[in-house]
Regions:
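Conserved nucleotide-sugar donor-binding
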Residues: 46-47, 126-140
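Short, flexible, basic/aromatic active-site loop/helix in glycosyltransferases
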Residues: 83, 101-122
Length: 166
């Protein structure tokens, strides 16, 4: 199932889905909170894995989900896998360099052992596109809220501190 959480203004009519696999849940703009909204979405799911993706994410092909799920087969401790974010072709040089630095072209596995070398960057996790092992997510209490940004990084810190990996 796909759960679409749509932020709406007062009086705005929520979108409707004609696909039985897609359920739309409107959230009043005044009630929106990054951590709480994602926690709400996760609570709707009965799946083994939950994926969070922002409305402006543009997958480069139709293999995004299956490629992300492969990350969970690398090591049994993996609890979060996030997607690589590329700069748009028309982006300025700062945007391009930021994406290259934050999202290198090689995957990595981050654990508590990386804290000495990477510091806080050990906890980096994209808030644009990430998949969570639902069992671990639930065991760790899910997203913290209220949270206005970095909800995925906060969750990644909980995952790594509990001896899981990202």
């Amino acid at each position: 199932k796909i759960f679409l959480l749509q932020t709406i203004e007062d009086g705005e009519k929520p979108m409707e889905s004609n696909d039985p696999k897609i359920e739309v849940y409107p959230i009043a703009k005044k009630d929106f909170d990054h951590g709480h909204t994602r926690a709400y979405g996760a609570s709707l799911s009965k799946a083994d894995y939950v994926m969070f993706m922002t409305q402006d994410a543009m997958p480069v092909d139709d293999r995004l989900t299956q490629e992300l799920l492969k990350g969970f087969t690398i090591e049994p401790t993996v609890a979060i896998v996030y997607g690589r974010q590329l700069a748009r072709p028309d982006a300025d040089i700062t945007e391009k360099m930021t994406r290259i630095h934050s999202y290198p072209d090689k995957s990595s596995l981050k654990t508590k052992a990386d804290l000495e070398q990477l510091g806080i960057k050990t906890y980096f996790c994209s808030d644009v596109c990430a998949v969570y092992d639902k069992k671990v997510y639930d065991e760790l209490g899910g997203f913290v809220y209220p949270t206005i940004f970095n909800e995925d990084m906060i969750m990644a810190s909980k995952v790594i501190q509990s001896d899981h990996s990202v």
